Amino acid sequence: MFAPLQNDTFLRACLRQATDYTPVWLMRQAGRYLPEYRATRARAGSFMGLATNTDYATEVTLQPLERYPLDAAILFSDILTVPDAMGLGLSFALGEGPRFATPVRDEAAVARLEVPDMGKLRYVFDAVTSIRKALNGRVPLIGFSGSPWTLACYMVEGAGSDDYRLVKTMLYQRPDLMHKMLAVNADAVAAYLNAQIEAGAQAVMIFDSWGGVLADAAFQTFSLAYTARVLGQLKREHDGVKIPRLVFTKGGGQWLQAMAALDCEVLGLDWTVNLAQARARVGENGPHAKALQGNLDPNVLFASPAQIETEVAAVLDSFGRPHLDSSQPGPTHIFNLGHGISQHTPPESVEVLVNAVHTHSRSMRAVRT
């Protein structure tokens, strides 16, 4: 059904297998910083018009790959498609971000929540299949979802938030309601990601964008536990091929040790984390060893080309030399930003970044020890 994969560097790095260079892709790589994306978005008329149209979603997913030699594509969609399918009424006002018409703020609203019919998300799965075919084996396709906790933040707040007052009020006043919501969210996310895998996704990523706003014990109880519930239900392989699972928690560096116990292959790190220390704690060998992904500050891309190259080298050097033994797994690194790329990023800066990653990481492997 799909063309053979020509560049499997990203997938091999996810599975802690030796690679010739460090693979690179960027969170939000298909996005507003690209003029061609803005043109397609204008034709679509709205963000949801873009995300729910298979042809448009395919077009914008491939746009960054036409410009840059990236090592993976990521589905163009939004993390809030799942609560939208639950009937919360998602909309995007220009310049304001996502908003739900019917937020979940009381016992009755929580009681009405249920895992949505995946048929309501058919447009996402059709896009996955269309993108996979259009890639024609060039690079792997990553599917994704928001984490149960991050979805709950939007579902309760009704939009983005500066202080998370409403969702944290529910968490502390009615933890029973929060647990009910998170359980439904976790089972919905698992079903959603499994359907993406069935449709052609070759890896899946859970974005816990707001895990870092939680207090220490609350993170383990209300975020990590439900991310683990999702991972426990995900397909490990499809058509005999392993499907790597990636988890990214923005602000989660302090919980790296706890996150290492997650049943996944890759941990994504934001720019506040020291890669060398992360490798020493969870990236070497052992029962919970993980591939690491990250973690350049996205604002580096506003610097000069020479400074971008310097900062890229610093991230690669911080992780250190990946292992070179193709006969066994070992420490591996996937280069990414520490969060999504800014819409204001000059497109030429991304070209500098990608070329710097490939060039410097090859030279690191060429050094004899």
Curated annotation (Swiss-Prot):
Keyword set, alphabetical order: Cytoplasm, Decarboxylase, Lyase, Porphyrin biosynthesis
Localization of this protein: Cytoplasm
Source species of the chain: Polaromonas sp. (strain JS666 / ATCC BAA-500)
EC number: 4.1.1.37
MF term (GO), any: uroporphyrinogen decarboxylase activity
Enzyme class, first EC level, given as a word: lyase
UniProt binding sites for substrate: R28, Q29, A30, G31, R32, D78, Y154, S209, H339
Reactions the enzyme catalyzes: uroporphyrinogen III + 4 H(+) = coproporphyrinogen III + 4 CO2
Subunit and interaction comment: Homodimer.
HAMAP family per UniProt: URO_D
Keyword Cytoplasm: yes
Lineage: superkingdom: Bacteria
Function statement: Catalyzes the decarboxylation of four acetate groups of uroporphyrinogen-III to yield coproporphyrinogen-III.
InterPro entries, alphabetized: UROD/MetE-like_sf (IPR038071), Uroporphyrinogen_deCO2ase_HemE (IPR006361), Uroporphyrinogen_deCOase (IPR000257)
Protein name: Uroporphyrinogen decarboxylase
Annotated family: Belongs to the uroporphyrinogen decarboxylase family.
UniProt-annotated site: Transition state stabilizer, residues: D78
Biological process per Gene Ontology, one example term: protoporphyrinogen IX biosynthetic process from glutamate
Functional pathway: Porphyrin-containing compound metabolism; protoporphyrin-IX biosynthesis; coproporphyrinogen-III from 5-aminolevulinate: step 4/4
GO cellular component: cytosol
Annotated CDD domains: URO-D (cd00717)
